[in-house]
Amino acid sequence: MKVFILALLALAATTAIAQLETTCSQGFGQSQQQQQPGQRQLLEQMKPCVAFLQQKCGPLRMPFLQTQVEQLSSCQIVQYQCCQQLAQIPERTRCHAIHIVVEAIIQQQSQQQWQEPQQQAQHKSMRMLLENLSLMCNIYVPVQCQQQQQLGQQQQQQLQEQLTPCTTFLQQQCSPVTVPFPQIPVDQPTSCQNVQHQCCRQLSQIPEQFRCQAIHNVAEAIRQQQPQQQWQGMYQPQQPAQLESIRMSLQALRSMCSIYIPVQCPAPTTYNIPLVATYTGGAC
């Protein structure tokens, strides 16, 4: 009998999630089509979490059940499914999954509800979501998720300025220094080598949990300084160009600086999370 009841509850929860899928597809519209396959797969996997956090599930009315133990609600079933799915996601990808849930919830809310800037709304949603999921699922969620999203505009601007040498080096806006007077073959430092050293030194001084955000800003600064014609021919050119810039920046900085950069860095770049990039260019 209990097995039959649980089967009914699971069916009801599945129906709730199916209704959510329709809402999701309507709410996302074109932005859903821009997502990469990995992001779409994670969104499908995390739909129970979206359903539960939006409380799109209600108590099941089954008067024939006699005990309170059997009076489970569809929300409890969806909560279990949410935690089960989150536990199956590797730790390094959980930030990515949580970002997707936040983005899904925000896009489904009426825009009139957000009286403050969209980014601040995302920060609050991310913080609340982290607290809820960590407690509800008793599961590890990287601290970087929260800290990285709580950077304010002024902090991002400071990171941007601090890593100006990295922007300069990655764009190769430095040239070899001509030193004609040495008569023996010795190392002749170039301005690029000096800028590279400054870049690595600045990056090493940034706390690990903020390095992803710093690299995002560097990549965005580089992308904004490139002629717009380079990005013609792509659908929604900004996002693919930004992804490629960040990927290349990560590879270059990891190899040349020999410092720890979180593996999670590439994940948040697959969303339209606002980034501050006000660097105005020029070699340092």
Curated annotation (Swiss-Prot):
Signal peptide: 1-18
Family label: Belongs to the prolamin family.
UniProt function note: Seed storage protein. Might be integrated via inter-chain disulfide bonds within the glutenin polymer.
Lineage: superkingdom: Eukaryota
UniProt xrefs under InterPro entries: Bifun_inhib/LTP/seed_sf, Bifunc_inhib/LTP/seed_store, Glia_glutenin
Protein name: Avenin-like b8
Alphabetically ordered keywords of this record: Disulfide bond, Seed storage protein, Signal, Storage protein
Molecular function GO terms recorded: nutrient reservoir activity
UniProt PTM comment: Contains disulfide bonds.
